[in-house]
């Protein structure tokens, strides 16, 4: 068609319609598209909520109640945004673990993987600041605990905390700057996502076999468009069930109590999607050690493309690694469970064991298991 030859439409046509896609992609490869759609949902609902939200410690909690009670369909906007964050992270976690399983970090996709990890870190920062905005008990005390972690940095830690707070405690300046950053970061994420897509289309999509065969590609539209559309319908079905029937299931009841600096909640826990990393933080009794471990658990994801020694992409053809991979999934789920439990026996011990395996997988298994597998293959070939 003539409009396809125009510069703008040509770009859209090349990246959304005629984009060559491996013919054997399964439904797990559609979670990247679902993540993009959830990002759009979050931005749109966030803009509408920002129209009625007041970033002031005396008014923030009441402004959220005003949205829920007085604004037309405000309850729908708020529940969509709150539950949308959870579903956004669900989709992204599946996307990450799919990438780990099918070796989407192996050459030539190193930059693609690293850009995805950066997007994930930006998401976590955005979600944390958004959790502070309702100014409930968990909002206030979560902000206090997490920002205090920077005080573990030698010499300049206390100054960094005061700078983050805008004073000597979590107060009105903190809430204002968190609101500003929470509103700004999604657009930074959009920019990072565009870079992610450019890198993806530069090297092409991976596939379950991990073998690049350009002769086995078909256009994205209409084949994978309809496949992703089906995945979106299933996702939205579950999403709407939570919005309309269980809107508060994924939240914390203490956040319906207005922030009180004079009363500490019995258990201070973040949102569920932070729990695995929160468990890593708590598993080390030393403060600076816990902070290093928590941030290290994210930074280690950036090292995977450069420490990997396997010549085979897909875990389907790596039986030993497959066992290690599923043990990682179990360890990650255990960390998420332990993160919401009290700091006592046996939760502390389970958290420590799971944390050790988490780092063991990325620091030992990925760099050395590939070499061992290559040795076994060549030994049996030469036998």
Swiss-Prot record:
Provide the residue positions that the database annotates as binding heme b b566: 95, 196
Where found, per UniProt? Mitochondrion inner membrane
The cross-references to Pfam families, in alphabetical order and at most eight, read: Cytochrom_B_C, Cytochrome_B
- Please tell me where heme b b562 binds in this chain: 81, 182
Recorded topology in the membrane: Multi-pass membrane protein
Q: Name one GO molecular function term.
A: metal ion binding
Question: The organism sits in which domain of life?
Answer: Eukaryota
- Cofactor, free-text remark: Binds 2 heme b groups non-covalently.
| GO CC list | mitochondrial inner membrane; respiratory chain complex III
Q: Name one GO biological process term.
A: mitochondrial electron transport, ubiquinol to cytochrome c
Q: Which cofactor is essential here?
A: heme b
For this protein, the parts annotated as crossing the membrane are 31-51, 75-97, 112-132, 178-198, 224-244, 288-308, 320-340, 347-367
| Main localization category | mitochondrion
Q: Which InterPro entries match?
A: Cyt_b/b6_C, Cyt_b/b6_C_sf, Cyt_b/b6_N, Cytb/b6-like_sf, Cytochrome_b, Cytochrome_b_C_euk/bac, Cytochrome_b_N_euk/bac, Di-haem_cyt_TM
Q: What does this protein do?
A: Component of the ubiquinol-cytochrome c reductase complex (complex III or cytochrome b-c1 complex) that is part of the mitochondrial respiratory chain. The b-c1 complex mediates electron transfer from ubiquinol to cytochrome c. Contributes to the generation of a proton gradient across the mitochondrial membrane that is then used for ATP synthesis.
This protein is called Cytochrome b
Instruction: Give the originating organism.
Output: Phytophthora megasperma
């Amino acid at each position: 068609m003539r409009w396809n030859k125009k510069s703008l439409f040509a770009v859209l046509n090349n990246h959304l319609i005629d984009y060559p896609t491996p013919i054997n992609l399964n439904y797990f490869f559609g979670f990247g598209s679902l993540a993009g759609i959830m990002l759009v949902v979050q931005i749109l609902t966030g803009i509408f909520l920002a129209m009625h939200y007041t970033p002031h410690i005396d008014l923030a909690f009441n402004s959220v109640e005003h949205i829920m009670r007085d604004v037309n369909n405000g309850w729908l906007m708020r529940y969509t945004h709150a539950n949308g964050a959870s579903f956004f992270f669900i989709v992204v976690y599946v996307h990450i673990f799919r990438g780990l399983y099918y070796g989407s970090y192996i050459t030539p996709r190193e930059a693609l993987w690293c850009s995805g990890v950066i997007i994930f870190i930006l998401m976590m920062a955005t979600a944390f600041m958004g959790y502070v905005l309702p100014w409930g008990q968990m909002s206030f005390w979560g902000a206090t605990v997490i920002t205090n972690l920077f005080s573990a940095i030698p010499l300049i830690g206390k100054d960094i905390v005061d700078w983050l707070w805008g004073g000597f405690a979590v107060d009105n300046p903190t809430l204002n700057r968190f609101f500003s950053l929470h509103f700004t970061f999604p657009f930074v994420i959009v920019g990072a996502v565009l870079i992610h897509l450019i890198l993806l289309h530069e090297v092409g999509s991976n596939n379950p076999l991990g073998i690049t065969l350009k002769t086995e590609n078909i256009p994205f539209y209409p084949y994978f468009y309809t496949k992703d559309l089906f995945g979106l319908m299933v996702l939205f079905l579950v999403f709407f069930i939570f919005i309309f029937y269980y809107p508060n299931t994924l939240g914390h009841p203490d956040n319906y109590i207005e922030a009180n600096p004079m009363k500490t909640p019995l258990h201070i826990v973040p949102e569920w999607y932070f729990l695995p990393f929160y468990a890593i933080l708590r598993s080390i009794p030393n403060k600076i050690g816990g902070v290093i471990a928590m941030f290290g658990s994210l930074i280690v994801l950036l090292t995977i493309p450069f420490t990997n020694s396997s010549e085979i992409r897909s875990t389907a053809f790596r039986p030993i690694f497959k066992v290690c991979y599923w043990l990682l999934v179990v360890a990650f789920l255990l960390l998420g469970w332990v993160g919401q439990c009290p700091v006592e026996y046996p939760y502390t011990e389970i958290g420590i064991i799971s944390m050790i395996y988490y780092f063991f997988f990325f620091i030992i298994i990925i760099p050395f298991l590939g070499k061992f597998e290559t040795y076994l293959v060549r030994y049996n070939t030469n036998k």
